[in-house]
Amino acid sequence: KVIAKAVIMAIGVTPEVELAKQAGLEIGVTGGIKVNHHYQTSAPHVYAVGDAIEVTHFITQKPTRLTLAGPAQRQARAAADHMYGRTYRNTGVIGSSVIQCFNMNAASTGLNEKDCQKEGIAYQTAYVIPKDKVGLMPNARPLFFKLIFADPSGQLLGAQAMGEGNVDKRIDIIASLIMKHGNLEDLKELELSYSPLFGTAKDVVNMAALVGLNVLNGEYKQVPVTEIRELQESDAFIIDAREAWEFEEGHIKGAVNIPFSEFRNRLDEIPKDEPVYVHCLSSQRSYNMVKALNMRGFDNAYNLMGSFLGLSMYEYFTDKTEGREPIVTNYRFDLL
């Protein structure tokens, strides 16, 4: 017996290509069976589809492997169409997927940040944490959404979403636009069905597009959540724009509490000769505060992406599993 608090069984099947090798079929650079646009192998009259083949990524146009049922079924249809002389347009794959773990749902599509870095793609990100439906509605929960787009074109490259609500809907929207070479402007103007029970008038994907356009247009400066620990450890000037009672419940160690509701009367406490990093709970108040500070001559103000909610989600697991010293006095995982 193994004593554990939780057991995770990752029992996915590894695709088998040994038979293909023994049959003399050409194997691609990724280790999958090499096929052409019509899923024909190097052997005459032999087709291959599914997890064992090498496919082309829609964005990078490079060979990759993808073990998903949806693309496999489309490949089977395409191979059959070709056998009967029907035309087929092979657009490649972007790897859209979704998973549920306990009460949390997570989904992704396209490229992530590591993919962009590996491929040498210039990119930016927009990280927003709104509620998945109008806040007054029962069971409105935070939805963590990261959008990745090319810099400076704004072309959509990928997205990840996590929350208790319909993350699949948001990721499917991004996936559809990626396959149509959509950009931030397209996403901003996208008209989606709305009712307070199902979402917000400005859906999370529209909101992410607006944030992305602000970033591309140089409207304000931001720092990713991955760099906040380094800032805290270097004694950077970090402002917590939440109310005092929120600050007391948990905050970044060393942060200065200057609530958004009070900062106009406390400008003399904010330095102009060093970078100032502002955050709140989900980056809404801190964004407004950074913009207001910019208008008052504080060109040294940065918004911390994800703010305290995003930081708590990012730091918690490593702190607990590795026994690392937390940079926060307490974590928070929910909106007000």
Model-inferred region functions:
Residues 1-78, 173, 177:
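FAD-site-proximal beta/loop scaffold in flavoenzymes
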Residues 9, 28, 48, 239-240, ...:
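Redox-cofactor binding/interface segments in oxidoreductases and associated redox assembly factors
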Residues 23, 42, 119, 251-253, ...:
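Short, structured coil segments at secondary-structure junctions
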Residues 25, 81-88, 121, 179-183, ...:
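Generic secondary-structure signature for well-ordered alpha-helical cores
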Residues 52-164, 200, 204-230:
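Mid-to-C-terminal Rossmann-like scaffold of FAD/NAD(P)H-dependent oxidoreductases
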Residues 165-183:
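A short, polar/charged loop-to-alpha-helix boundary motif
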Residues 185-226, 231-237, 244-277, 281-336:
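Rhodanese-like catalytic fold shared by cysteine-dependent sulfurtransferases
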